[in-house]
């Protein structure tokens, strides 16, 4: 390090020691501070570190960021530019003191790996230029296969080059096409009523008068509404670069008063981590901004975590995927190596490189056609073949009826989950999608969703996210105008998505209670359940609204398929829907419906 660099670093950083940690005070400065922070972390003498920022607005560029190849679940793998890299610390505290952290370009702002205690508090994250393209829809001609936009320019970055849009043009990166796109209500910024997910790849773009662009796409089936704001986040291959916060193989984690206005993937992503709290925090668009998207994927995401997870008093809005997704991972049996060893495969390309198990983990064996968890066995050896295949050796002999195409699920890494007192609305996809066999409590939340508000869905198909639930309590929530996209959903939807080798009738999820909720809805469907054993729907108040025209007016309020032991009691409905309960022959055998008001049993 040069003498000048040393002097600058000393001016920006001051060091002190408390009883437990090395405290690094970071004074405010203008310009790029990324390398200063990197040096502070890398030169820390203790394994207990606290970064304390003087309140201010800080800029983080990628020129001198750490470059590291990362496998990131549900994102694109590759070299990532990391600003805050914490690896192997006993404890880490980051205190922003109300600061704003502004990033530019493809960046993984925070990565925590192998840390025993983490606390991040009092900080807001944003990007100076969002990785998005949006414009007001001013005209549509379905017959001629075009729509016209007046693109936003202030605060956005894009160019029209050779009759195609290039964006964002930051650090020589552009998406290959407009990609994943949705129309939004210009006033509320919510996804537009009746909207469908669409992937936009224009054949060509014409420049018209007054800053208007005409987009031709000959295979487009669903056109945006004139007056809406059409927003695009880029092609699927590149539009999940990294989460704002990546935490893996860590424990005892607290985020408090942390707000994310933009990120190039998820907001908070946790892999194989234990005991997590997200408190008084948020993912939402900055006040006064004309952006209609906050972050490009889930607000929060938990993959193969354990211990207790709590999300409380948070606000999640504007993201382009779920409010939260909690799941394990199914791996598929590729080959039986010997009596104790099996080769397994990660099946989704955004799972490649994920650590499914380590020595000492207990694993369930699930053998088609039944989706039921069968015997357990303990892993004694893990041999990674590559990012796709791994050999697992077990303590006991593998069952002789295990075969290629069956799946394994990690028993050790499953969390209990509580979501309390949050507001989740005005975003793509579902408020909550969750799959864990341990206790789930969802209470006192304000929820409004494009798709189903709450979805319980394990799947041995596509994402291969495990697994079936065994104890769920959904109570005292306020649901407002949920499932307003074009596709058919419900307030609560339970729908396993299993591969062709698995039974489509065997019971999958169990012991779900949906009680004391207030539901204000423009449409009919409240609960849509498939293959549930033990579903209680009681003491809910349902009120019809006239916010939108019903999308599926012929749907039943409660729709049951291949279910067992369902009780629908003491619910009250006020509105004009007359179709109350629909149940197939299997569900009717053990169905109890009584003491409801306002709809037919």
Tell me what each language-model feature is.
Residues 24-51:
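Acidic Gly/Asp/Thr-rich repetitive segments characteristic of extracellular carbohydrate-active
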Residues 38-43, 60-93, 102-121, 129-146, ...:
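Extracellular beta-strand-rich solenoid/capping regions of secreted or surface-exposed proteins
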Residues 49, 56, 82, 90-92, ...:
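The right-handed parallel beta-helix/beta-solenoid scaffold, focusing on the short coil/turn
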Residues 52, 59, 85, 93-95, ...:
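Extracellular beta-strand solenoid repeats
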Residues 62, 103-109, 129-133, 242-244, ...:
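Short glycine/acidic-rich loop motifs that flank beta-strands on beta-rich extracellular proteins
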Residues 186-240, 373-417, 425-426:
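Small/polar beta-strand repeat architecture
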């Amino acid at each position: 390090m040069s003498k000048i660099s040393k002097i600058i670093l000393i001016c920006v950083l001051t060091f002190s020691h408390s009883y437990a940690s090395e405290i690094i005070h970071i004074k405010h400065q203008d310009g790029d501070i990324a390398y200063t922070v990197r040096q502070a972390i890398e030169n820390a003498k203790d394994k207990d570190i606290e970064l304390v920022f003087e309140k201010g607005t800080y800029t983080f560029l990628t020129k001198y960021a750490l470059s590291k190849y990362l496998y990131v679940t549900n994102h694109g793998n590759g070299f990532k530019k990391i600003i805050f890299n914490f690896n192997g610390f006993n404890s880490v505290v980051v205190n922003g003191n109300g600061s704003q952290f502004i990033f530019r370009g493809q960046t993984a702002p925070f990565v925590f790996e192998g840390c025993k205690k983490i606390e991040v508090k009092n900080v807001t994250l944003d990007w100076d230029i969002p990785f998005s393209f949006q414009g007001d829809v001013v005209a549509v001609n379905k017959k001629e296969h075009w729509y016209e936009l007046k693109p936003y320019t202030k605060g956005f970055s894009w160019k029209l080059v050779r009759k195609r849009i290039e964006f964002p043009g930051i650090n020589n990166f552009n998406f290959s096409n407009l990609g994943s796109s949705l129309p939004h209500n210009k006033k509320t910024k919510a996804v537009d009523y009746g909207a469908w997910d669409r992937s936009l790849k224009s054949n060509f773009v014409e420049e018209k008068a007054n800053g208007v662009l005409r987009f031709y796409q000959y295979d487009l089936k669903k056109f945006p509404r004139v007056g809406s704001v059409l927003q695009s986040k880029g092609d699927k291959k590149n539009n999940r670069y990294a989460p704002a916060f990546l935490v893996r193989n860590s424990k005892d984690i607290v985020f408090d008063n942390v707000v994310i206005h933009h990120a190039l993937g998820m907001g908070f992503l946790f892999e194989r981590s234990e005991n997590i709290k997200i408190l008084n925090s948020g993912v939402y668009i900055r006040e006064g901004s004309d952006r209609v998207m906050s972050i490009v994927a889930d607000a929060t995401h938990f993959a193969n975590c354990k211990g207790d997870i709590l999300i409380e008093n948070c606000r999640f809005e504007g993201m382009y995927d779920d409010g939260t997704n909690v799941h394990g991972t199914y791996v598929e049996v590729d080959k039986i190596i010997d009596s104790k060893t099996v080769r397994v495969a990660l099946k989704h390309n955004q799972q490649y490189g994920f650590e499914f198990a380590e020595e000492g983990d207990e694993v369930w064996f699930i053998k088609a056609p039944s989706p039921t968890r069968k015997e357990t066995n303990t892993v004694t050896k893990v041999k990674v073949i590559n990012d796709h295949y791994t050999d697992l050796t077990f303590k006991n002999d593998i069952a002789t009826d295990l075969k290629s195409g069956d799946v394994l699920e990690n028993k050790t890494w499953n969390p209990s989950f509580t979501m309390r007192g949050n507001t989740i609305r005005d975003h793509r996809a579902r408020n909550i999608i969750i799959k864990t066999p341990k206790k789930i409590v969802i209470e006192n939340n304000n929820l409004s969703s494009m798709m189903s508000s709450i979805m319980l869905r394990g799947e041995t198909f596509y994402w291969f996210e495990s697994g079936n639930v065994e104890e769920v309590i959904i109570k005292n929530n306020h649901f407002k105008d949920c499932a307003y996209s074009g596709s058919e959903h419900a307030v609560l939807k339970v729908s396993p998505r299993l591969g062709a080798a698995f039974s489509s009738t065997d019971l999958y999820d169990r012991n779900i209670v949906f009680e004391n909720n207030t539901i204000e809805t423009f449409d009919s469907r409240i609960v849509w359940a498939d293959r549930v054993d033990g579903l209680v729907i009681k003491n809910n108040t349902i009120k019809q609204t006239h916010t939108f025209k019903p999308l599926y007016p012929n749907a039943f309020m409660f729709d049951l398929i291949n279910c067992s032991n369902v009780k629908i009691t003491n619910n009250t409905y006020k509105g004009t829907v007359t179709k109350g309960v629909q149940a197939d022959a299997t569900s009717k055998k053990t169905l109890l419906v009584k003491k409801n008001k306002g709809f037919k049993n």
